[in-house]
Amino acid sequence: MNSSAFLAFLVNPFASFTSAFGSNGISNPVSGPSTGGGSTCVSGDITLSINTPGIKLGYEAPQDQMAVTESFVELFQVDSTFAADVTAGGPSVISGDYSIFVKLCLPSDPEILAQVKTVQLLTHGATLDHTYWDIAPGYSYVDVASAAGYATLSYDQLGVGNSDHPDPIQVVQATAQVAVTHALAGLLRNAELGGYRFDKVVGVGHSAGSTLTQGITTQYPQDFDAVILSGTSASAASVPLTMAAFNLINANTDPAPQFQHLPAGFLTQQSAAGIQFAFYRQPNFDEDAFRRQVAHKQTNTLGVLLTLGGIVAPSTEFTGPVDIVNGENDLVFCGGNCLYPTDQNSVALSIFYPAASKGSQTYIAAGAGHSIAAHKSGPDSFKHMIQFLQDNGL
């Protein structure tokens, strides 16, 4: 962090957030501690201009539950042509200005704050939001990172949480999410968030957020100095089982107040049991963290689901260190056993990152399901992630 920003932070931790913001600054900033209490954070909205290729999807958002369910029945049929048919409409352009919710957290300890040189860009998974990274006291990756001398920027993806919710089919697609993440990485690189300048930027993703982060290293290999990917593998064989467990519904039919304003096409899980089935392994998770995640459940769209595979390709030009972290019993991407028939972390590393540096690592979180952050082994996973960065001089 540059010295002038550090001095301003000591006088008023959020002075630099509320003065001299350009068009890329955080608007209406709100300051406060992290959920775990170990970080000092500012959150607010940032407007990003997006212009990226998309796909003209031949699909309209289903208006009732029978139509939602039938879409997934047809998508996962053994000889399905659903995805091919829907994505046959040709290219489109996704363009516009969108408000994205961000949360920048820094160490509360002034001595640690003075040493901050690296920021981690945290990208959550599908049906989650930025709170995944700071889910509960004792299960906050944000706080672990702060204690180790790192800044973090978490955010709500386009169409999620406090960010804008444009057309869930034609706009909220995977390429748009990549464009948002790329833009945020650029702002961090160029000291355009509150004037804070960081020497290094690390991309950290979970689940679909790992897919987006991996997509960044393929399309924009200079965005990140290192990446940490959790809840991911080279196989999507168990995704249909996950979708069945979710029993996705139009979010505006869910009683949760955060969904009442949404149009059809934004989908969420029907029940807490479905979330547990897909994301958790009993009795190895913290029940308070589980309840918090259920309370903060978010949305996904078929716009993303139908286009996510299009951004997946080996990151042949990314030469930085890569860390792949999975729960031992991840259902979504490992079918419940990430060590069967071989270590799926090592497979993913070799396929997606053939040019990664020798400092790359993998880690299996003992007894954890997909949502590693909320499991009892979560703190050990966080410790490993920080050690990986330190081992690589970041």
Predicted regions and their residues:
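Glycine-rich "HGGG/HGxG" loop immediately N-terminal to the catalytic nucleophile
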Residues: 156-171, 370-371
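Short, surface-exposed "cap/lid" segments of acyl-processing enzymes
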Residues: 109-153
